A protein has these predicted regions:
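Alpha-helical oligomerization segments
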Residues: 151, 162-247
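A long, hydrophobic alpha-helical segment
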Residues: 127-146
């Protein structure tokens, strides 16, 4: 595995850990540094940053009477804020952002649309994290997890379907078609239910189905932004009327 410790004491260098490391005594040749690694994967960097971030945060909450050091004084073995700052700089430089729920932090690629929707008044707080975390690397290939998130988004959009139709009829029609025919809200893969059964979906490869789940997610974001713009337009019209009445 290739890992990056940018600012972690090795000055922007990369090192490789052999597959059998940890199964035998460490040797000097176990670690080597690469300025420009050939098999670097961004997910490994994110994994490392998440591991370090959560480890450092947990370290801060170790009780003072934890059995090490002298008396009840916890030795400051680690400059926590320094390392958290270094992690933050790495995450910022690669265009990622932090998302936290229940005290656990993950890093996801920045998406202006996802951020805007997650912070919208149209979305309850408990769903905001799911909107952001949909883009997390651990979600790749996790069709059931993605499906679960899409079901929640569909449930939230359903009561607003009429407003969405007025704002963008094509988007409304296409999005709810995907909800209802892509094995998201309905079981479209059970031949016993002829009304909902879609043979094409049964034959679809998992990679293609995941692609369309991701497209559905993007369309959900667009739908929320359209709904927000509809409310914004109402406020704008009121402002415009007030300005014109006194002109």
């Amino acid at each position: 595995a290739i890992l990056c410790y940018n600012g972690f004491g090795v000055s922007r260098r990369w090192f490789a850990i052999p597959q059998d490391a940890g199964k035998r005594p460490e040797r000097k040749e176990d670690f080597h540094f690469e300025k420009e690694p050939t098999n670097f994967k961004i997910d490994e960097l994110i994994l490392l940053c998440e591991y370090m971030e959560n480890l450092l945060i947990a370290y801060q909450y170790i009780p003072l009477n934890f059995p090490y050091g002298y008396g009840n004084m916890r030795p400051q073995f680690i400059n926590v804020q320094f390392y958290l700052q270094q992690i933050g700089q790495v995450i910022e430089r690669i265009g990622y952002m932090q998302a936290t729920q229940n005290g656990f932090t993950i890093f996801v690629e920045k998406s202006p649309a996802a951020i805007a929707v997650a912070e919208s008044d149209l979305v309850p707080k408990e769903l905001s994290y799911r909107i952001i975390s949909y883009n997390h690397y651990s979600m790749k290939g996790q069709l059931e997890a993605k499906k679960s998130a899409l079901v929640q988004l569909a449930s939230l959009l359903e009561p607003k379907r009429g407003s969405l139709k007025k704002a963008d009829k094509t988007l409304e029609s296409d999005l709810f078609y995907l909800f209802n025919n892509l094995n998201i809200r309905h079981n479209n893969v059970d031949p016993a239910d002829s009304a909902k059964y879609k043979p094409f979906i049964v034959q679809m490869k998992q990679e293609e189905l995941e692609h369309w789940y991701d497209e559905t997610y993007q369309m959900c974001l667009l739908a929320f932004l359209q709904l927000e713009q509809t409310e914004r337009k109402i406020e704008f019209d009121r402002l415009k009327t007030a300005i014109e009445e006194q002109t």
